[in-house]
Amino acid sequence: MNQRNASMTVIGAGSYGTALAITLARNGHEVVLWGHDPEHIATLERDRCNAAFLPDVPFPDTLHLESDLATALAASRNILVVVPSHVFGEVLRQIKPLMRPDARLVWATKGLEAETGRLLQDVAREALGDQIPLAVISGPTFAKELAAGLPTAISLASTDQTFADDLQQLLHCGKSFRVYSNPDFIGVQLGGAVKNVIAIGAGMSDGIGFGANARTALITRGLAEMSRLGAALGAEPATFMGMAGLGDLVLTCTDNQSRNRRFGMMLGQGMDVQSAQEKIGQVVEGYRNTKEVRELAHRFGVEMPITEEIYQVLYCGKNAREAALTLLGRARKDERSSH
């Protein structure tokens, strides 16, 4: 591979970053995958697979491993960031001085900025300035299924139409990976954060043993909370009926591949928060997202009762069953009401 002709540099060699890199390479593109741990990257290069997360998926020949950040960023103008939301800003500040002058950045990170609850677009603009084209991809994607080439669909939104068109062409594969463009940059970002919170609630409900009726009601009312918050931020309502909204919400709330759902199930079964996190053994994005989404809702005056009760369980020591009973005991409402 020529040093500067890769189609994409992927920042983040976890399960999802690796799966996206594999998908791009499988589409015939030269891809560079960077990870912060040189030993981990050396192991990936030796094994030609990510044995820790995706042991049965060999790397295509066009997937190249790199532990030197400057070299990775020099390889392509297109940068795909796939890191946990709580380090998103830190990573962007790290890569900014090393990016090519023609660089364009897209992220698959789902969540909001830690502590502030800001959208990641605001974090990116603060870190990178106003000139770099930005984009986000989001939707119902489990890394193992994506890497295995099973049919998957996502949404793509960008501040730059040319970048959006180029990304759609790069990522889209008619055999297994559909990429839908969406002009709603805010909505596509927000859906991925809120669904993590609701998935914890769905897991709690199932952990308690409330059954399918309760789970479905929680998903539906969770979608209403997502839509209300989105409207307050200026998102398009239709976005939340698409891949980045309802699609990702249903997937994360109903399948045990979801760490957020499994985490919630443990809480519903009586496990404490710290023990549940330790048992999951990987980042549970919804834990931080709950605090951030709640902060955002308060800032914009949006009532989100499910989010509030999940927050009470995660951060205030409330029992999951008590939280569920609080929700069930709320005053009668019109289903179409704003609270």
UniProtKB/Swiss-Prot annotation:
Active site: K195
Listed SUPFAM superfamilies: 6-phosphogluconate dehydrogenase C-terminal domain-like, NAD(P)-binding Rossmann-fold domains
Alphabetical UniProt keywords: Cytoplasm, Lipid biosynthesis, Lipid metabolism, NAD, NADP, Nucleotide-binding, Oxidoreductase, Phospholipid biosynthesis, Phospholipid metabolism
Domain of life: Bacteria
Binding positions (sn-glycerol 3-phosphate): K110, G139, T141, K195, D248, S258, R259, N260
EC number(s) recorded for this UniProt protein: 1.1.1.94
Assigned GO CC terms: cytosol
Binding site residues for NADPH: S15, Y16, H36, K110, A143, R259, V283, E285
One Gene Ontology biological process: carbohydrate metabolic process
Subcellular location: Cytoplasm
Catalytically driven reaction(s): sn-glycerol 3-phosphate + NAD(+) = dihydroxyacetone phosphate + NADH + H(+); sn-glycerol 3-phosphate + NADP(+) = dihydroxyacetone phosphate + NADPH + H(+)
A matching Pfam family: NAD_Gly3P_dh_C
Annotated Gene3D superfamilies: N-(1-d-carboxylethyl)-l-norvaline Dehydrogenase, domain 2, NAD(P)-binding Rossmann-like Domain
Pathway as given in its UniProt record: Membrane lipid metabolism; glycerophospholipid metabolism
UniProt GO molecular function: glycerol-3-phosphate dehydrogenase [NAD(P)+] activity; NAD binding
PANTHER family: GLYCEROL-3-PHOSPHATE DEHYDROGENASE, GLYCEROL-3-PHOSPHATE DEHYDROGENASE [NAD(+)] 2, CHLOROPLASTIC
Family: Belongs to the NAD-dependent glycerol-3-phosphate dehydrogenase family.
Record's function text: Catalyzes the reduction of the glycolytic intermediate dihydroxyacetone phosphate (DHAP) to sn-glycerol 3-phosphate (G3P), the key precursor for phospholipid synthesis.
NCBIfam families: PRK00094.1-1, PRK00094.1-2, PRK00094.1-4
Protein name: Glycerol-3-phosphate dehydrogenase [NAD(P)+]
Organism (species): Shigella boydii serotype 18 (strain CDC 3083-94 / BS512)
